[in-house]
Amino acid sequence: MKIDFRSDTVTKPSKEMLDFMFQAEVGDDVYGEDPTVFALEKFASEYFGKEAALFCTSGTQSNQIGLQLNLRPGGEVICHADSHIYRYEGGGIAKNSGASVKLLDGNYGRLNVNQVKSAINPDDIHLPLTQLVSLEDTANKGGGAVYEFNDIKEISSFCRSVNLNISLIIISCA
């Protein structure tokens, strides 16, 4: 079987996967009638120690929901200039969240705490309010480079100290 890791949009299921899907018990998840979705969401919420989980059909859908939860219209997200949420999601940040983007260059897709500190807009009515820092641990434009754990902790600690939301998106497409 050929495995294609370029994107979740080009992956094709194997015969065994298709057979399993055709045998799966399904129902309407809106009415709580899909035991498979319910079991997956329950497992994920318990695994991550969260109150609830939501099954999404794509990485883009997941990213856009996460962005909307952390941004308000007129706000701004700080991210790398080659980030997936900026380059490959059809303008979703502006379209879905009504927010703008501040793009930063970094080493293989990674930002550092000093870049984040200097990118935050001052309290000025003429500028969008910085609301989110989005990091990506990626095999995408970053060429497979991952953040050092201490770098994420440092950025996260800074963001908490200034009451700024932070997200870490894991991207596995080429």
Question: Where does each model-flagged region fall?
Answer:
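Buried hydrophobic positions in well-ordered alpha/beta secondary-structure cores of metabolic enzymes
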Residues: 5, 44, 62, 93, ...
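General beta-strand structural signal in soluble alpha/beta enzymes
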Residues: 7, 31-33, 54-57, 79-80, ...
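Conserved N-terminal alpha-helix of the aminotransferase class I/II PLP-enzyme fold
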Residues: 13-59, 81-82, 86-87
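Conserved core of the PLP fold type I
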Residues: 51-71, 104-105, 137
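Conserved PLP-anchoring active-site segment centered on the Schiff-base-forming lysine
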Residues: 69-87
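Active-site-proximal loop->helix
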Residues: 88-100
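PLP-dependent aminotransferase-class I/II
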Residues: 97-140, 146-154
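Catalytic PLP-binding core of fold-type I/II PLP enzymes
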Residues: 147-174
